[in-house]
A protein has these predicted regions:
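Single, function-defining residue in the core of a domain
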Residues: 1-58, 62, 91, 98-106, ...
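Major-groove recognition helix of helix-turn-helix-like DNA-binding domains
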Residues: 73-91
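Short, conserved aromatic-histidine micro-motifs
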Residues: 109
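Short, mixed-charge aromatic SLiMs
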Residues: 64-75
Length: 305
C-alpha cells in the first residue's frame, strides 16, 4: 500500500486509460460535454460500486465527503446527482461495453496459466443464468409474472480466474438454451453447463468447432452403449461409457460418439451422470471439472449482494 494515496487511486492505476480513451473516441462520447467526461463518469460509478452506494444522492453525498482524496484518481470534482443521472441515461452504452471487453481480454491473459485442478490445455468456461428480481412499480417494463418483475443475466464465466467472459441480459422469460446459439466458440475450449442447456444440435455445433461440452445428462436420455472403460470406484466413478444417442431424432441432430460418465459425490452422496464429447480426459477429471461449475453460482451470489 502506498502512503498518501487513496485505495481508489491505486486501484485505478490498473485501469488502461488509453483503452478507455479509444472507446470514447470510437463513439464520440465526449463531444459537446461541458463538465462530466466519460472517464469521470466511469470513476464516479466505480466508486459507487466499490463502496456499495445505493442511490445517486448517496453517491453525490459520499463523493463530496471524500472528493479531495479522489483528485489523484482522476476525478477532479464530484458531479451533481442530476449531471450523473443525465450521463447514465444518455451516454452511449457501447463505450463501457467495449471497455469491459478490453478488461476481460486483459484478465484472460493474466489468468491464462491459472490452475484448474485438472490437466487441461485449453480454456474452460461455465455457462449459466440467474434471474435478477426488479420492482414492478419502478420497472413496469420488466414484468414476467403476474406480480413479479425481473431480468435474466446469462453469463459465460472463465474458470481460470473466475471472471465473466461475456454477459447477456435478456427478458426473464427467455429460456437458457437459446443462448447457446450466441456462443462464439473457441477451438479447444471446454464449456460446462447444467442440464437446462441440453440441445443436441447446438452440442454438435460445439463438437465441430472443435471444442468440448460437459453437462449433466437428463434422466430420460436414451443412450446406446458401445464400449465401457474400467471405472475407478475409489474416486467415485460408477461407470464410463461411450456410445451414441438411441432416439432417432436426437441422433439426427448429434450423430457422433458421446461419452457418459456416472459419478457418486462422496460429500453429498448424490449420483450424477455427465455427458460430454471428450473421450480422452480421465473420468475423475470430468467429474472434477463439473464441480468447478459451482464457481458461477458463487459469482451470481456476489452480483446479487
Amino acid at each position: 500500500m502506498q502512503a498518501g494515496r487513496s485505495v481508489m487511486a491505486q486501484l485505478m492505476d490498473f485501469v488502461p486509460k488509453h483503452e478507455f480513451d479509444k472507446c470514447v473516441q470510437r463513439y464520440g462520447g465526449d463531444k459537446r460535454v461541458r463538465s462530466l467526461s466519460c472517464y469521470s463518469q466511469f470513476l464516479a460509478m466505480c466508486f459507487a460500486q466499490l463502496t456499495g452506494r445505493e442511490s445517486l444522492r448517496d453517491i453525490e453525498t459520499c463523493l463530496r465527503a471524500v472528493g479531495p482524496k479522489l483528485y489523484h484518481a482522476g476525478l477532479r470534482s464530484p458531479p451533481p446527482k442530476s449531471t450523473l443521472a443525465d450521463a447514465n441515461e444518455k451516454r452511449d452504452w457501447r463505450i463501457f461495453a467495449d471497455f469491459g471487453r478490453a478488461l476481460i481480454a486483459q484478465a484472460t491473459r493474466l489468468y491464462a496459466d491459472d490452475p484448474l485442478g485438472v490437466e487441461l490445455a485449453g480454456a474452460a468456461y461455465a455457462l449459466d443464468s440467474t434471474t435478477v428480481d426488479l420492482c414492478l412499480t419502478v420497472f413496469p417494463w420488466a414484468k414476467y409474472k403476474q406480480t413479479r418483475g425481473g431480468l435474466k443475466m446469462h453469463t459465460l464465466l472463465a474458470l481460470r480466474g473466475n471472471f465473466p467472459a461475456w454477459v447477456i441480459v435478456t427478458p426473464a422469460q427467455i429460456h437458457d438454451v437459446r443462448l447457446l446459439a450466441e456462443l462464439a466458440l473457441e477451438p479447444g475450449a471446454f464449456y460446462v453447463m447444467d442440464r437446462g442447456y441440453v440441445d443436441f444440435a447446438q452440442f454438435h455445433r460445439i463438437h465441430q468447432a472443435p471444442a468440448f461440452f460437459l453437462t449433466q445428462a437428463k434422466r430420460n436420455l436414451s443412450f446406446r452403449r458401445r464400449y465401457s472403460a474400467p471405472a475407478d470406484k475409489g474416486r467415485g466413478i460408477r461407470f464410463d461409457q461411450t456410445g451414441v444417442l438411441a432416439e432417432p431424432a436426437s441422433r439426427q441432430r448429434y450423430p457422433d460418439t458421446l461419452r457418459r460418465v456416472g459419478y457418486r459425490d462422496p460429500e453429498r452422496g448424490r449420483r450424477l451422470v455427465f455427458l460430454t464429447n471428450n473421450t480422452t480426459m480421465p473420468a475423475a477429471d470430468i467429474a472434477q471439472l463439473y464441480r468447478r461449475r459451482w464457481q458461477i453460482e458463487l459469482f451470481f451470489r456476489w452480483i446479487k449482494q
